[in-house]
Regions:
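Hydrophobic/aromatic-rich transmembrane helices and adjacent perimembrane loops
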Residues: 135, 227, 336-374
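Extracytosolic helix-loop segments that constitute the early lumenal/periplasmic catalytic or substrate-binding loops
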Residues: 80-103, 110-113, 117
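Extracytoplasmic
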Residues: 382-499
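Transmembrane-helix motifs of polytopic, lipid-linked glycan transferases
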Residues: 129-154, 161, 168, 193
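Signature aromatic-anchored transmembrane alpha helix within multi-pass, membrane-resident enzymes
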Residues: 47-54, 252-253, 361-394
Length: 499
């Protein structure tokens, strides 16, 4: 029996719940009327609102790290550490020191040359060049996410949403790396380009070996971005790709050849530096794991879609990628001194997963109940709320608080003043804030991280370290003024104390 709406009598669709009907009339009508200057469909208008909302969040959170980059302050200790080695490349000095010294370099070489070249091309100092390059890399990663989701899920638009969320969450939650002189983001951008190229070639049934070789290059820029190559190699083997053995063999040989070339160029110091002394334990993992709360919601949204679409290639690939990203993150957090950059692989995988989840929202069980439009509205709203739900609001304070703006200017003044005192000290000097010694023109003579790890692992004692410093004529500078970029970013504190 046919009803007036064309459905069968026994298959009448249930009436939407009262909340859903209210939602359609209230929120749905609002979305359709947001842009009244031109006749847009409901879908077009929703799409524009999604882009506007996530795009505004990305711009909002990027304002602070971009503004902060102008100041001569140490954003994070690795900033000055990287700048010192970039200076070494610029001046033709050794890049990998004597393993028995008090300094070490456990990063592969390409980033130091890349940043030094970038600075030379754009007439910037190495510190500023590294900061600028990290912002460029972040934007490139967002573009790569868009292209990757287009291949996996067939939607450039929803890929762009994943990219915008990635910009926002990184600028929001990784401020010691975004806009800082650190090679992690640029290395990940090279790796992300390799992933995009890999998927494009696999989709076209072409040999993905060139893309795997690009990933090898990325590994010599920054060596701990391992989730993407593990995912791609596993995918080739799982899908029994006819180029799998060739790709694995050639890329593996290229990686070994690269290591051999580095040993030839940098001599016997290279491997001992790369295999730096480090302590390991569950304590570091437990101290860091709470940081995953920031992407937990995104991972939940992705997982809900992936389980509903688990038979699709997109879901299976992202399951591999997220799984390896989580594995890489937890593994690295076992090492003492490892920070938020260990989760960058996982955040990138989550962003790709979010884009695919938006594209495939109509395939989920919840979509069958509330409709794909409402489901996507909920997803966008939830992601935005998680981004904003924090007392730490640097960008807001940048506009609201004179004291907040003045704090970094004051910190730069402190650093320059401290550097002027170090500059007149005779001989080699150790600075807790390495940028002070660098600004004073002093060489890099004590790596506090290496010294700390030597002490933790029992490879040195405080007495042996003191003896080495005395033998090298190293004096410790006692800082009296704050010289690191640690402005008070609590919005609640500002509200309570503004009068």
């Amino acid at each position: 029996m046919q009803l007036e709406d064309g459905t069968s009598a026994g298959l009448r669709k249930p009436s939407p719940p009262l909340l859903c009907r209210f939602y359609d009339r209230a929120v749905g009508a609002f979305l359709v009327d947001v842009i009244a200057t031109r006749p847009l469909s409901r879908t077009d208008t929703r799409s524009l609102v999604y882009v506007a909302a996530l795009g505004a969040a990305a711009v909002y959170f990027l304002i602070f790290p971009i503004w902060r980059g102008q100041f001569l302050v140490e954003i994070w200790p690795t900033e000055s550490w990287n700048a010192y080695w970039q200076d070494a490349v610029s001046r033709g000095l050794p890049l990998y020191p004597d393993p028995t010294s008090l300094v070490g370099n456990n990063y592969p070489p390409l980033s130091f040359y890349g940043v030094a070249l970038f600075g030379k091309l754009f007439a910037m100092g190495n510190l500023q060049a590294g900061r600028a390059l990290s912002i460029v890399a972040l934007v490139l990663l967002a573009i790569e996410i868009t292209g990757i989701v287009k291949i996996l899920a067939g939607s450039t638009f929803y890929g762009a949403l994943g990219g915008l969320w990635y910009l926002a969450i990184m600028a929001r939650n990784s401020t010691i790396y975004v806009g800082a002189d650190d090679p992690q983001l640029a290395g990940l951008a090279i790796m992300g380009a390799g992933l995009w190229w890999f998927l494009d070639r696999v989709a076209a049934e072409r040999d993905p070996t060139p893309a795997l070789l690009l990933m090898v290059v990325a590994g010599f820029w920054k060596h701990n971005n391992i989730a993407i190559p593990l995912t791609c190699i596993s995918w080739l083997l799982i899908t029994r790709n006819r180029f799998a053995v060739r790709g694995v063999m050639i890329s593996g040989a290229a990686a070994l050849a690269g290591l051999g070339l580095c040993i030839t160029i940098y001599g016997p110091n290279f491997l001992p530096n790369m295999l730096a002394t480090r302590s390991y334990g569950m304590g570091t993992l437990l101290a860091n794991i709470g940081h995953l709360q920031w992407i937990a919601l995104a991972l939940f949204i992705w997982l809900f879609w992936a389980l509903s679409s688990r038979r699709t290639a997109a879901a299976r690939f992202t399951m591999l990628h997220v799984g390896f990203g989580l594995f890489a993150c937890l593994l690295q957090w076992l090492g003492h001194g490892v920070s938020g950059n260990a989760e960058f692989d996982l955040i990138l995988a989550a962003a790709i997963g979010i884009g695919a989840a938006f594209a495939g929202a109509s395939d989920t069980l919840l979509s069958h109940r509330v409709g794909p439009d409402r489901l996507r509205d909920i997803m966008v709203a939830a992601l935005l709320l998680r981004l904003l739900a924090s007392d730490r609001q640097e960008t807001a304070l940048l506009f609201l608080s004179d004291d907040f703006r003045a704090s970094l200017r004051g910190t730069e003044t402190n650093l320059r003043f401290e550097a002027s005192k170090v500059a007149i000290m005779p001989g080699n000097v150790e600075c807790k804030t390495k940028l002070i010694c660098r600004q004073a023109g002093k060489p890099f003579v004590v790596d506090e991280f290496k010294v700390e790890e030597m002490l933790l692992t029992g490879k040195a004692t405080p007495q042996s370290i003191a003896e080495k410093m005395a033998a090298a004529g190293i004096t410790t500078f006692n800082e009296t003024l704050p010289a690191t970029a640690q402005p008070k970013a609590s919005l609640i504190y500002w509200l309570k104390n503004r009068h």
